[in-house]
Curated annotation (Swiss-Prot):
E.C. numbers: 3.4.16.5
Active site: S265, D457, H514
Location within or outside the cell: Vacuole
Signal peptide interval: 1-17
Protein name: Carboxypeptidase Y homolog A
Family: Belongs to the peptidase S10 family.
Catalytic activity: Release of a C-terminal amino acid with broad specificity
Native organism: Fusarium vanettenii (strain ATCC MYA-4622 / CBS 123669 / FGSC 9596 / NRRL 45880 / 77-13-4) (Fusarium solani subsp. pisi)
Listed GO CC annotations: fungal-type vacuole
Keywords: Carboxypeptidase, Disulfide bond, Glycoprotein, Hydrolase, Protease, Signal, Vacuole, Zymogen
Amino acid sequence: MRLSTSALVLGAASSAVAFDQKVLGDLKKPAIDLDLSSWLNFGEEITAEAKAVWEEVSMLAPDAVEAFKKQVIGTKPKKANRRPDNHWDHVVKGADVQSIWVDKNNEKHRKVGGRLDNYNLRAKKVDPSKLGVDKVKQYSGYLDDEEQDKHLFYWFFESRNDPENDPVVLWLNGGPGCSSLTGLFLELGPASINKKIEIVNNPWSWNNNASVIFLDQPVNVGYSYSGGSVSNTVAAGKDIYALLTLFFHQFPEYAKQDFHIAGESYAGHYIPVFANEILSHEDRNINLKSVLIGNGLTDGYTQYEYYRPMACGEGGYPSVLSESECQSMDNALPRCQSLIKGCYESGSAWSCVPASIYCNNAMMGPYQRTGRNVYDIRGNCEDSSNLCYSGLGYIAEYLNRQDVQDALGAEVSSYDSCNMDINRNFLFAGDWMQPYHQVVPNLLEKIPVLIYAGDADFICNWLGNQAWTNKLEWPGHKDFKNADIKNLKVEGKEYGKIKTSGNFTFMQIYGAGHMVPMDQPEASSDFFNRWLGGEWF
């Protein structure tokens, strides 16, 4: 996840769009309706606090607000050159899969539910010897939404161990707008890229005992592209369901395995909705067994309360702010939470956008202005041009090589680790502060949920993640809140704490920032394998 204090205020109007957003409760309806005329009467739809924030932005950037009123500014489409179907080893037509019927309880049913006729899946076998990322079987390709001109890129790695029986995991990075190939090469995939742009094997890769799909989503992220854009989590969920359905149809040898979704950061938004979308289809070929969210943003109302404690010495690391700065964050919290509450209650972008603008500036701004790494409170940014990490630059250089793009079938003209247009689109669609934690109880009725957090992260810190899991209202709330906290160990060495009850588990991982598998590879491999093995559920 990347946040820019100045961009949030001064870029507000120039990047914004006028939205009428549906209330979250109905996840089957499109979340967004464009309505430019709504600017004229939006003051009747939002709280006085939210309106005041809009007025503050108007004073800071009047020209930008005028531009906001007049036009919708969307994501610039990526330049792409679609490869012909004969380039691919497999082309799966969603309409064909949608038309398959089977007998069930003496009645005819579609084999898999959901609308698929606008989707197609393309796949090619990747020659491991060409790239040297791993020796295992690999596929890459695109999910195409032909109706919406959306094309999502994925890269699949088979398990190094027992692919016929090991589970399958979908990995999602956050942002919103950051490529999941970051997770592949910087965190948990079979290899990393060094400063010489060379492949380096990762002995702690998550595909040691699981097959892993790395997906660039939403569109216009990484190798994915579109003539349009996606600016809300619910819409993106339909694409994920289609991708998995068509992938498992083409490769049924993986469909019989257990399936899990894992991710970090803004995936705290994505994963509850994506899992809920999958579970909503009774007839499906996706054997979803659990979800894992690392250092996620899921419940803004609760989590934003813990930026001040984390920055001011209450999260296990020394304070990085002065007393007066800490006090100013305390003073700002009531207004921040009031704005978020208004967003939760209305679901309207007119309420949710001011909440994001005000809270990000008031609760994150003081920390950001120190120059410290928002993803790791232990130090400063090593590379401000690459979200604090030089490794992102190495990855981008590698993935922009023509031989790499040809080997994978990539169709875009360039690769970027993060697309900040997407980040702004989600923000100004009101998606940022939506209460996606309210979807989690529905998941807990059906599957286990793991929330893990590196304890040195600031931006989605462990204090906030611990707090929202303790506060979440679900039938097992009391038992979970009162559950014993136990040590996590590998090879006799303690690396964290765990609390688990029923289908809900929370982990605090020591000495790790926002990207736990990067900072603590052995520890993350340990809890990942134990989780997939069902130790805590």
